Curated annotation (Swiss-Prot):
The lineage of its organism: Bacteria, Bacillati, Cyanobacteriota, Cyanophyceae, Oscillatoriophycideae. InterPro entries: Hydgase_Ni_incorp_HypA/HybF_CS (IPR020538), HypA/HybF (IPR000688). Involved in the maturation of [NiFe] hydrogenases. Required for nickel insertion into the metal center of the hydrogenase. This is Hydrogenase maturation factor HypA. Zn(2+) binds at C70, C73, C86, C89. It comes from Rippkaea orientalis (strain PCC 8801 / RF-1) (Cyanothece sp. (strain PCC 8801)). It holds the Pfam family HypA.
Length: 114
């Protein structure tokens, strides 16, 4: 399960950006073609957050649909796996244009009143 290491890296990046301020929420974008299982990230998140500024934070995951573009005719198509055939011309020469992402889209930190 490579999602454990990925989750640890996400938490390290967010904690570094938070600069010691407690984090309330983290939003990720995960592409359906990324080979990263969103449910596994959710499972690892609470465990990996323990003892960090992310402890108690909520995790929101936005799944990005897979899309491809035919290199022969330019048609854009939905992809549910990292390969397929063009709906228009039948070509297998597809370029993945969306769905392989893994992004930390945003994080929400607690307000600090001074």
């Amino acid at each position: 399960m490579h999602e454990l290491g990925i989750t640890q890296n996400i938490i390290a990046i967010v904690a570094e950006q938070a600069k010691g301020i407690p984090v309330k929420r983290v939003t990720l974008e995960i592409g359906q073609l990324s080979a990263i299982m969103a449910d596994s990230i959710r499972f690892c998140f609470d465990i990996c957050c323990q003892g960090t500024v992310l402890e108690g934070a909520t995790l929101e995951i936005i799944e990005i649909l897979g899309r491809g573009k035919c290199r022969d005719c330019g048609q854009e198509i939905a992809l549910f796996q990292p390969f397929g055939t063009c709906d228009r011309c039948g070509s297998i020469q597809l370029e993945i244009i969306q769905g392989q992402e893994l992004k930390i889209k945003e994080m929400e930190i607690e307000e600090i009143c001074v």
